[in-house]
From Swiss-Prot:
It is found in: Cytoplasm. This is Fumarate hydratase class II. PANTHER family: ASPARTATEAMMONIA/ARGININOSUCCINATE/ADENYLOSUCCINATE LYASE, FUMARATE HYDRATASE, MITOCHONDRIAL. GO terms for biological process: fumarate metabolic process; malate metabolic process; tricarboxylic acid cycle. It comes from Yersinia pestis. The gene is fumC. It is an enzyme of class 4 (lyase). The lineage of its organism: Bacteria, Pseudomonadati, Pseudomonadota, Gammaproteobacteria, Enterobacterales. The keyword Cytoplasm applies. Involved in the TCA cycle. Catalyzes the stereospecific interconversion of fumarate to L-malate.
Amino acid sequence: MATTRSEKDSMGSIDVPANQLWGAQTQRSLAHFRISQEKMPTELIHALALTKRAAAQVNMDLGLLPAERAKAIMRAADEVLDGAHPTEFPLAIWQTGSGTQTNMNMNEVLANRASELLGGARGNNRLVHPNDDVNKSQSSNDVFPTAMHVAAVMGVSEHLLPELKVLQKTLADKAEAYRDIVKIGRTHLQDATPLTLGQEISGWAAMLSHSVRHIEATLPHLCELALGGTAVGTGLNTHPEYAVRVANEIATLTRQPFITAPNKFESLGTCDALVHGHGALKGLAASLMKIANDVRWLSSGPRCGIGEISIPENEPGSSIMPGKVNPTQCEAMTMLCAQVMGNDVAINIGGASGNFELNVFRPLVIHNFLQSVRLLADGMRGFNEHCALGIEPNRDRITQLLNESLMLVTALNTHIGYDKAAEIAKKAHKEGLTLKAAAMALGYLTDAEFDEWVRPEDMVGSMKK
């Protein structure tokens, strides 16, 4: 039995593995772009299959594609969407910047599979043509940007935002639970005036609430689809109703509010929607890094650190120090946030590098965008389940550090003035005295006045409620 078959494209014939559905252009790309290990993301492949399905449906409805072929293409696309044929999409991210080779990879796979579904063969004698049928009314230049937006919206809406909202609620619940625990605040990594543990955590929860709104604000632009613009945005070789209809079909299939882009020249020539969208993801990464760093600092110890909170002990932390447990979820979170920030730089460069009617950094952009979505969604789920839900206050340590802080002297500002209060703090620090002892030694207030005026629970403001 032959192990290869001949496939033909505009450059001639080439042998491809007989057991694979792809064709000539995919085989050429495999030969020419043997670069690293990064392959086209599965989310993008599925979005591309969905786009091809929608195009076949609309082309059939408009009378542009015979029903028999259109339905076979749709069945083949559904197989891809259901997880079949995962080895048929082997191409590297590092290929043509328009994604043409991956578009043709999908066209060839669907054409050969549709031919089989119709009782035909693979290869040059197939019953469905990759360009004339599967790619009808399309160009790589509008199909690939469309698939990018579909994959991005689906990833953000169905994976990232749900995990973000769960983590935000966990922190909001913790803020409420610990609203009455007064602790020392810190600025510049130095002691500051008191606040409650609930107030501190409420800041984290608010950061994530803002991130939800920032990310959601980027979705309308991402829901604009380039399909129908064809090669340069003019819609050459498409039916007048095609662009609107195919966007509506994609919206129906995904249950997302996709629309046809009002200006296809912008859709083809830029990656602005993804640049903007990833900017919001980078903002989320910045917030998560701050939260994770605060958590690991506050839980540092167990005996020689701050130790105001405890977090779950999930696994041994050292191969040499017995009993050591580390804040591993915080470390994983900060690392993935750093990667997202790096991805943002690459996306910005890619987005800024379009020329004339087409941006040709698209595989780079979508690879990094979808990686960031996966990292953030998975990271937030793990951080929530294995860290945030288990945050508990160490009340004795909180009280100890609160009572030792020299910054409680700030409560005296309105009674004896800043200069005298500063003198008390300096004397206490230099001579190892309590604030009360230093104040009384200087003769600035009585024992009773100190106890009345320096009350940490009265220093946390109206926000305690």
